Amino acid sequence: LHPETFGFIFETLCIRDLRVYADALDGEVYHYRDKNNLECDAVLHRRNGSFGLIEIKLGGDAAVEHGASTLRMLAAKIDVEKMGKPSFLMVLTAVGDFAYQREDGVLVVPICCLRD
């Protein structure tokens, strides 16, 4: 299986899982892309107005760094007067045994750590 193809399959499976969790949190999952092609794989938006930004990556330091960079750029563009700040920025990965928070505040969470 080509790595890019596997990445698309993994992203689809993650979105499915995120939708299940979002439903339990009274929320929805959306994809975001702006006119400059800055995108976010998943925006978890709750009915209370809170939201989190999620990039999905297979793993590896370079991919996690790219995802975190994208999240920080997108968060910097948000009009916090209208939308508020994101509750969290997360890179969801395929590999790893535990979740952690980077120095820049971005969460790195292996898919196996998503639970009730």
What are these regions (language model features)?
Residues 1-116:
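A cross-kingdom feature that marks ATP-driven nucleic-acid transaction machinery
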